[in-house]
Each structure stands twice: as structure tokens, then as C-alpha cells.
Amino acid sequence: MSFYNHKEIEPKWQGYWAEHHTFKTGTDASKPKFYALDMFPYPSGAGLHVGHPEGYTATDILSRYKRAQGYNVLHPMGWDAFGLPAEQYAMDTGNDPAEFTAENIANFKRQINALGFSYDWDREVNTTDPNYYKWTQWIFTKLYEKGLAYEAEVPVNWVEELGTAIANEEVLPDGTSERGGYPVVRKPMRQWMLKITAYAERLLNDLDELDWSESIKDMQRNWIGKSTGANVTFKVKGTDKEFTVFTTRPDTLFGATFTVLAPEHELVDAITSTEQAEAVADYKHQASLKSDLARTDLAKEKTGVWTGAYAINPVNGKEIPIWIADYVLASYGTGAVMAVPAHDQRDWEFAKQFDLPIVEVLEGGNVEEAAYTEDGLHVNSDFLDGLNKEDAIAKIVACLEEKGCGQEKVTYRLRDWLFSRQRYWGEPIPIIHWEDGTSTAVPESELPLVLPVTKDIRPSGTGESPLANLTDWLEVTREDGVKGRRETNTMPQWAGSSWYYLRYIDPHNTEKLADEDLLKQWLPVDIYVGGAEHAVLHLLYARFWHKFLYDLGVVPTKEPFQKLFNQGMILGTSYRDHRGALVATDKVEKRDGSFFHVETGEELEQAPAKMSKSLKNVVNPDDVVEQYGADTLRVYEMFMGPLDASIAWSEEGLEGSRKFLDRVYRLITSKEIIAENNGALDKVYNETVKAVTEQIESLKFNTAIAQLMVFVNAANKEDKLYVDYAKGFIQLIAPFAPHLAEELWQTVAATGESISYVAWPTWDESKLVEDEIEIVVQIKGKVRAKLMVAKDLSREELQEIALADEKVKVEIDGKEIVKVISVPNKLVNIVVK
């Protein structure tokens, strides 16, 4: 057979690996460890798409490489299986979300195994398994005991169509929900919160210790949003009331000409005048219909209403109006701002809109035309006049502190984590509310608090989850006869994914989350590969929980993931019409190398776009494996380009990768394998071992494959192939194309055992030395010839060779040689006249 028969070979080796537990995690304490982690998937009904295997193949290459290098490798897989999609599907179809999820997991697992990934399935976790979420609930009870889980009446992002509140991070820029694209409104509700803000400074500072891309670290820094400034207290004229604003520029207080409160601010109703009451009430209602993102959009028209009240500027005693406006959020800072329109563009636009005063306090701009937002010396600022920014801030803060109306303050943009969901399909929150007004956590001995089975899973719409309908489960009685109700909210999908990497380390432990010695052995995760879309949410939450567990003494490291790598996106093929609108692939036909709209006949432009059901350009890996084989898919996705680049899917590229594997198969099965080394491939073989090793280490898989191709080309030019080089090459390609490598290994090594633990090949540095080198020959400073010569020739030998060259002879014929300058290994310069 002259080609790689993937339909026979791939199932054969997948069966072998499963039967022999080839990838069971090593436990030899004398070996170094390597923990390669994938972001575990949500098992959707659609199954895997070709984007999933890109990251999975990368960690699989590293895992196979490290096993061959003698490491104990932990390379697990599991399922992030709670969450809205399964519940939504169950409501739409009448199916049980647990059954639907189990079917999806079985399909995902089948697809993953068909791709030849070397996971240790003995460590599989599933966030919906009570034996798993027992420990999710345990972590929650510890947070509760430490005061880091608490209940609060807060304005939440309510999604009527989903029947639940969602976190700020789950609201899209257009004000709709990330899940489903439904409208989001603000609504006050009793919610469980996690005090992630208590860890803000540590979450910020410890980023410096991580091997993550700066772009991801910056996204987290910006989300945490540390600001240094001052709290300033404003008294409300004619009342005993006051409010505090946080500002990073207290030095501009003399330019504050009005203040703005969030519509939800607790003072609004108390200070609003009778004349303004109706307008304020209407505005508050309108603001409640908008998401935070929609309210804070810089481009939107400025809206607001005067309350009828005035504040007293603490530095000059001036009365300034108090407005409400939706761009101020009750959940951010103090829910109040001092407006300095001369030096803040949003305040300037607001002042212009409502004809409010603009007072310049920093020189350098024309504040009638626009806000001046650069630094400048202070003016119109009494005792601050003539000072720069730093000196003025120090002086004004000292003044405020002396007067008792302000103080230096550090704040964070980060808000506490909204942790409850009004849905069924999630981990029950292990809290009981007693009729005497107290609440207690469910004791550890009673965990897991199992999610009860019910067909009635539609949200109540009242703010309570469907669990509120299950009386037998809901109502409990204490030993002393006091009655109570279980918490009916469930945890968000982020809960189970915030610690799953710890459970992989000891997945069957019934006594604790994981054994301390095993956690010491395996943490931190050596490399974590997944999409950049999780930069803020999942990664920030996981870091928070990890730091909390570190404080409890459960985990031995401050950070969970030492190295993070975000793979790029695999784009689908799509088509655009003359208006730039995307056209679904089933509406396109190809004629004479061009693409046309089936219905209109318009010629279309081919363009890459994100794979989507609507464009009908999603590529199913099952189809690729059937036609080309898993190894082809693996090699193609790694050869497409740099791992972090977003690149369009190409059928031609897939065919090219398949042809390469066929060439590899023919090279090993057709070439005469010899026991004696004739030296012909010494240099290219050792170059290949070195390059592939170094490029796997640096995740440059595309260039590693390119070097493997160089070797195949060189080897095909020879009649015979040295057996050790054949073996070494098969080992080098094994992480990329493991099924093919296993099969070829048996043809040259015939051990009957897997290649997986055969020691990784090494290179001989002496074989990399160039025997020949190119020199240039110059005549009167101009290059006239380039010659290949033996390395390290003397000046005299170089001169002799250069003068004997036919081209050089022609150039110097009939001329007098004045001088010859020779530089070994570089050049010969002949001076003539």
C-alpha cells in the first residue's frame, strides 16, 4: 500500500491506547511533572467544531513530547456542563437537561477520541456530577464562613426571556445578553454576591509573576481598574444630608459647577423638590430599562434631570445644582460624581446640553470650544493657583482632610461578583434561611446538596428559581423545631469552572477537594490553552477562588496557571455581495473559478468570517476525519500558521497536509532501511531534531512541521535510509500525527508497544557544523563572484582559489593586480588598475 490508510490505522491505535491505558498519568515521584490543561468545553448539542481541536492538538503535542522526555504528564479532559443552554433546550423541547447533557457529553467524547488526543480519561470530571459539585458547594460554604459570600439588595441585569439576572460581564456592548441576545433591564433584587473586591490588589499585583501575554494581563488590569484619588463630601443645601464623590482629580474642585447622582442613589428621593418630583420619577424609570453598558456609552446623547436641590462646594462654599443622569452608575464608585466640565469631555457635553457653567481651572486650552483634558498650571483655584498637578493634589487633599470633608482614597472598577441565578440547571446554593431571621450553611456532612429532579423547570418570573416550587425539597425543620427554607437560587456556570483544574489532580477523593501532597506535586498548571474570550470572566474568577483556597491552606501556590496561551480563531469561508453583506454558502455556486449568488447571479467576493450556523460555513471534524483522517486534521491545524493567529479554513490546505502524510508513509514503508549510517543525511537529520525540539518548546508548531517536510524531501533524494534516523524521524512526527507514527514505529522497531514513552531523540551538535561556506569575490569593491569553499581556509588558500575562478579571470584579464585582501570565511577583494 502506497498511502496512509487512516480508516484502518486510526481506530486500531485508538483501541490500543484505550485497552492499555497508555495515557494514564504517571506517578513516579522521581520524575519531573508537566500539567497541560485545556479549557474544558461546554458540551453543546452541536458537538465539536474544527475550532475546538486547535487548542486541544497544541496541548496534546506538548503532552506527548513531555512524556517522551521522561515527564509525568497530567493531561485531562472534562465537561463544563451546567448552564443556560441545556436548560433552555430542555424547556423548548420538554427534555430533561440531565439526559440532554449526558447525550452531548457522549458525542463530544466520541469526537475527541476520534482525534487521537492523549487524555487520561480516568480523571474525567463533570460539573453536574454531585460528587464534583459537592466541593463547589464546599468552597461556597467556606466563602460564606469568611464573610466573602453575602446577600444584598442590588440592581441587577434582569433578562425577562431568560428569567434570571446575569453578571455585568455577560451583558454585550449593545445592552443585550451574551446568551440569547435578549434585552437587559436594571431591577433591584436580593442576590448572593462574592466579595472578589477583597482580593482586588492581589489579583492586580500578582499578574506581574505570570507568563501570560501582556494583552490579556492588561484586560484584567483594566477590569480591576485601580484608581488613586480622594473621596470628597458635599453637603446638601438646607438639609442635614450629604453625599460623597470619588475623584482622581481633587485638584480641579474649584471647577466643579454641578454634581450628578445615579438615578438609583439613595438620596435622590429625599432631596428632590416637589416641582421636580414627576420629572425625576420618569427619568428613574427610563434609566431602569437600560443596561450599564448602554448607559455609559460615550457616544450616546447626554440625558439628565435636575433634582431641584443644591450641593455646597466644600472648597469655595458655592451652591451647585444636583442632577441625576444615567451615565452615573450606583454600582460604580459612590454613585455620585462632581462635574468639572472645563476638563472632562462628558461633563463638558452635559454642561453644553443643559446650559450649565464651565469654569477653567487648568490653563492651556479653549474650554468654550472643548474640554481641555491635558495637564496645565492651576488657575481660578485660589490657593492652588500656579501649582502643577502633583503639588495641587497633595495640597487639596491636605486641605480637605483638615476640614473633615475629604480624604485620600484608592478605588477599583471591579465590582463584587453577582453569584446567584434564578434558574434550575445549576449547583444549589447550600444555605438555609430560618423563620427566626437567621441563615446557616448546610453542614459539610450533608454535602452535596443534590439538585432535585423535576420536570417543572420553567423560571417563575418572580425572581425565584423553579426550585421554589418543590415544597418537599424546599422546606426543612431544625432539631429545635424551627422551620426554614432552602435557598432557591442556583450558582452561575462560572462556579464549576473556577476550580476544575484542582479536581483533575485527585478526582475520586471523597474526603477532601484534593490531597495536599498531590496538589503540591502538580500545581501550578504548566500551560493553560484556550480562547482569549475568557480573559476577564473565567480567568479572573479562577484566580480569585485559587487565592481564597491558598489563604485557607488548601492549595500551595498563589496562582493557578503559570503560562497561558490563547490560540487564534479558525475562520470559515464566506462570501460578500457588492454591499458587503455576507451570503450563506448554500446560496453560492462556483463557475470558472469565480463565485456567484445562486438567486441573483451577482458575482461574490470570497472572504473569511467567523463560522456560524446562519452562514452555513461550520466545518464538522467528523467529516474531516472520515475523508482525510484525524492525523491530517491535526497536522493541518498546526501548519495553518502561528498558533495564536486567526486563519481561514482551506480545503486545499487540508489536502496538502494529507499528501504530506502519504509521503511520510511511503518514505518509511518503501525506502530501504539500513543498519549502517552512510552519513548522507547527518546534517539535515540533526538540524531537524534540534529545530523540532526547540519549536515544540516555543509552541511554533507550524515551523516544526515545515522542518519535518525538509527532512522528508532530503530523505527522498537518497536511495537508503539509516534505521536510527528513520526511528528518530518517526518519534519527531509522533506528537503531530500519533496514529501514523505508531504504525510506522512497528515497521522499523517492531516492539509491539506504543511509541509514546520511547525517549525523545537528541541531536549531535558537531553534525550541524557547516563543512563549506560561501565567500564573495570583489574586484575594486564590487561583487563579481560568489564561491563555495571549504571552511577555515587560510588567506593564501582563499586568494589562490579566487584568482583561479573562471569569472574572476575574465574580469582581471589584461589588468595589473595591485593588491589582494583576503578575509577568511568572508571575502576576497582584488584591487586592479
UniProtKB/Swiss-Prot annotation:
Keyword Cytoplasm carried by entry: yes
Motif residue range(s): 'KMSKS' region: 610-614
EC nos: 6.1.1.4
GO biological process, one term: leucyl-tRNA aminoacylation
Gene Ontology terms, MF aspect: aminoacyl-tRNA deacylase activity; ATP binding; leucine-tRNA ligase activity
Residue interval(s) of motif 'HIGH' region: 41-52
GO cellular component: cytosol
Pfam family, one: tRNA-synt_1g
Catalysed reactions, semicolon-separated: tRNA(Leu) + L-leucine + ATP = L-leucyl-tRNA(Leu) + AMP + diphosphate
Localization of this protein: Cytoplasm
Name of the top EC class for this enzyme: ligase
Keywords: Aminoacyl-tRNA synthetase, ATP-binding, Cytoplasm, Ligase, Nucleotide-binding, Protein biosynthesis
Residues bound to ATP: K613
Primary site of residence: cytoplasm
Family to which the UniProt record says this protein belongs: Belongs to the class-I aminoacyl-tRNA synthetase family.
Record-given protein name: Leucine--tRNA ligase
Originating species: Streptococcus pneumoniae (strain P1031)
Organism taxonomic ancestry: Bacteria, Bacillati, Bacillota, Bacilli, Lactobacillales
Gene for this chain: leuS
